[in-house]
Amino acid sequence: MSTAPEKTEKNLLDPGFELTLRPMRYPDFYERYRDAIKNTWTVEEVDLHSDVTDLAKLSQGEQHMIGRLVAFFATGDSIVANNLVLTLYKHINSPEARLYLSRQLFEEAVHVQFYLTLLDTYLPDPEDRAAAFDAVENIPSIREKAEFCFKWINEVEKLDSLQTQADRRRFLLNLICFAACIEGLFFYGAFAYVYWFRSRGLLHGLATGTNWVFRDETMHMSFAFEVVDTVRKEEPELFDDQLRQEVTDMLREAVEAELQFARDLCGDGLPGMNTDSMRQYLECVADQRLARLGFAPVYGSENPFSFMELQGVQELTNFFERRPSAYQVAVEGTVDLDEDF
């Protein structure tokens, strides 16, 4: 009597749509989903009233910087969310991972709502708000960053499944782009401007909301890097010199795109914030992303911004401690934001 062939266990990027959560193949992804639930916050908890007063105190150059920042925020997380649905959820074949991605999509929606609220508060003129939402079309420095994103989306959007090593390599580059370059560099650059204002006692509401967005984005990036680690264990042949060079070139291109944005925001420079210091900061962050991916750093720069060292950690911790017990979701362990800067 013949026996049924033994089922071959699939890899994370194998085509298919696994549904079974028991037994779990990737329990770490499930634990990340559970941890993310503990970090729930809502836009209504961010108080922007004092920001309106602060905005009136800003110099013309600082007001220009804020206008550009909220214009970038208006579209940045929407691009991330679209790639999450159209690419990551489609090709990461793990129900545990898809649980986390579902939660991440919710968090991206909260971020979009937060930035929408920022726009309504910071830009009361309807024409100014409309221009901010059209930033991808009418602001060259933001358009350059968007085109960088779309290039890596277009690389995989027509793939129905990851049948070949070439397909999987293209997917990995998309995943690394959104984790290391977009969430891990573009948004970290934006956070630096926010915390620069915060270090001067300005825009408390923006900084508070950014603390919570930052915590979410750090978890998103960490999840994506764990996916990369898992694929590296399952299919090490994908991680050759070609991929290393492509990722390094990608990070270099992302740094240059973000520097173009910095030139737009900083102009001739503001006290404590200029293009040269942003270049050093971005190079430092890019090196950290490369190191996390197991590749050699290329810049050797150090973080020039003292205000980025654990900025806002105490407030972030206090937020979760002071919530009403009927709504509170516990946060366990320590809050360490320093490493990823």
Describe each PLM feature range.
Residues 2-341:
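Non-heme di-metal
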